[in-house]
């Protein structure tokens, strides 16, 4: 009997502090940084973002999204036998204990299930789903909780208008389970460390002292050029693995980073924007959280229906990129 992995629950969470472009523009202006709603929207498509309050960690956002995914899947916390959490903003400096372990504790899971973090920045969720898919198909795990959670507001430089207007905080989650029905149809992952310096957090720690910048750095034009190229290729690779054509894709959910990159992705696949779930305008770039958040929106508002084929693709620092083609 062939075992497949299938997404049976989705969930998402945004912290309540919503900051519009107008509000952020006013805040930046008070510090001598000039920008405008028109400038932000024209370059990114972003109208607002959400920021976590002080003391709220990635794990707190992750727990809320996970609860909603479990509720949709009609599973209890101790039905989970593996947690894979994608984040670039872990609860603890240095990354341990892992944020996945913190989420396990906060959810009240008592079965000693495996828990691990994945770090591939904005590609993290796609990487995590691919890992979960392989664990399930191998028969070692049945119910896997996959989460993307970020508090990027902690690592952006509010004196750099080219990046501080783009990012926000949030979390998204899916519950993947073993199934006799096809679910995940194909996954494909890539990385190229030669491009590591175009999107990075360059600071290093030596004996408790940060050497270099502790804020995110991004070469916007270089990221745009590379992202458009690799997203097109990896989507077609996933389709080839599944033996499908782009016309069979019902919905495309790219990493919600920049509307211009997303438009280019749809065009190169020969799909209209009416086939794309777009949420970037409401929460900005939430890194590893953006794809599962958009997926959850599409499922809950009824656009994404059972049996439909969804292409999810991400690109992020490292440089990393990947795609997942799944039947819902």
From Swiss-Prot:
Annotated GO biological process: fatty acid biosynthetic process
EC number: 2.3.1.180
CDD domains reported for this sequence: KAS_III
Gene3D superfamilies, per the entry: 3.40.47.10
One Pfam family it belongs to: ACP_syn_III
InterPro entries reported for this sequence: ACP_syn_III_C, ACP_syn_III_N, FabH, Thiolase-like
GO cellular component terms attached to this protein's record: cytoplasm
Reactions accelerated catalytically: malonyl-[ACP] + acetyl-CoA + H(+) = 3-oxobutanoyl-[ACP] + CO2 + CoA
Top-level taxon in the UniProt lineage: Bacteria
Sorted UniProt keywords: Acyltransferase, Cytoplasm, Fatty acid biosynthesis, Fatty acid metabolism, Lipid biosynthesis, Lipid metabolism, Multifunctional enzyme, Transferase
One example GO MF annotation: beta-ketoacyl-acyl-carrier-protein synthase III activity
Family, as annotated: Belongs to the thiolase-like superfamily. FabH family.
Record's function text: Catalyzes the condensation reaction of fatty acid synthesis by the addition to an acyl acceptor of two carbons from malonyl-ACP. Catalyzes the first condensation reaction which initiates fatty acid synthesis and may therefore play a role in governing the total rate of fatty acid production. Possesses both acetoacetyl-ACP synthase and acetyl transacylase activities. Its substrate specificity determines the biosynthesis of branched-chain and/or straight-chain of fatty acids.
PANTHER family reported for this sequence: 3-OXOACYL-[ACYL-CARRIER-PROTEIN] SYNTHASE, BETA-KETOACYL-[ACYL-CARRIER-PROTEIN] SYNTHASE III, CHLOROPLASTIC
HAMAP family, per database record: FabH
Name listed for the protein in its UniProt record: Beta-ketoacyl-[acyl-carrier-protein] synthase III
Organism from which the protein derives: Janthinobacterium sp. (strain Marseille) (Minibacterium massiliensis)
